[in-house]
């Protein structure tokens, strides 16, 4: 059986006025279901770029110049944007360092969780709301049945990051890409 995630000879480039900057060159890895892979490196080594490339969120002008990314054997680095969006929500969850980039300030966290759940899972809004409350509880949000109707700005940084983690888990993805998910949390919460 193919691995859950297979990355082969990934090369990420940025065109500049002075020529091409190769930011990541020849990254390969394979992740089996249930396996955890930690990527360690100096600041600027390309860890975040690699994660962004895997989930199809590489900021232009950055581009995958070579290599391939496969999810359960299916090539995903060449998918059109709309198709990749479906993969990102349903099959791959993402947790970033800054929770404010992952949450829409105009919608309650409940609205965002329910939308993610109903978009990717065959579930009614009321069932999705129950699941959203369970997710908030499982990530350590106190009084989730009340906090579900709060807006992102009404949560502390640490609590916002827990909401982002709940959002990443909402559609029951096969794979989660987490880029320093606990940076915004204090040390006692990081340990949890």
Locations of regions flagged by a protein language model:
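Conserved ABC transporter NBD signature motif
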Residues: 64-75
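The feature captures the beta-strand-to-loop junction immediately N-terminal to the Walker
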Residues: 40-41
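A short, proline-enriched helix->beta-strand linker immediately N-terminal to the Walker B motif
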Residues: 170-174, 190
């Amino acid at each position: 059986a193919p691995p859950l995630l297979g990355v082969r000879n990934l090369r990420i480039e940025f065109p500049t006025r002075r020529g091409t900057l190769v930011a990541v060159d020849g990254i390969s890895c394979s992740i089996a279901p249930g396996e955890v892979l930690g990527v360690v490196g100096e600041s600027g080594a390309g860890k975040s770029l690699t994660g962004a490339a895997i989930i199809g969120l590489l900021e232009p002008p950055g581009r995958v110049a070579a290599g391939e990314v496969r999810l359960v054997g299916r090539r995903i680095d060449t998918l059109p944007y709309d198709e990749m969006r479906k993969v990102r929500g349903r099959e791959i969850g993402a947790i970033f360092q800054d929770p404010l980039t992952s949450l829409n300030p105009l919608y309650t966290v409940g609205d965002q969780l329910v939308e993610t759940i109903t978009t990717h899972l065959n579930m009614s809004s009321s069932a999705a709301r129950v699941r959203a409350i369970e997710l908030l509880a499982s990530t350590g949000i106190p009084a989730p049945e009340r906090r579900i109707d709060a807006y992102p700005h009404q949560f502390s940084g640490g609590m916002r990051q827990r909401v982002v983690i709940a959002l990443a888990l909402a559609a029951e993805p096969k794979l989660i890409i987490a880029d320093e998910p606990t940076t915004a949390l204090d040390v006692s919460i990081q340990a949890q």
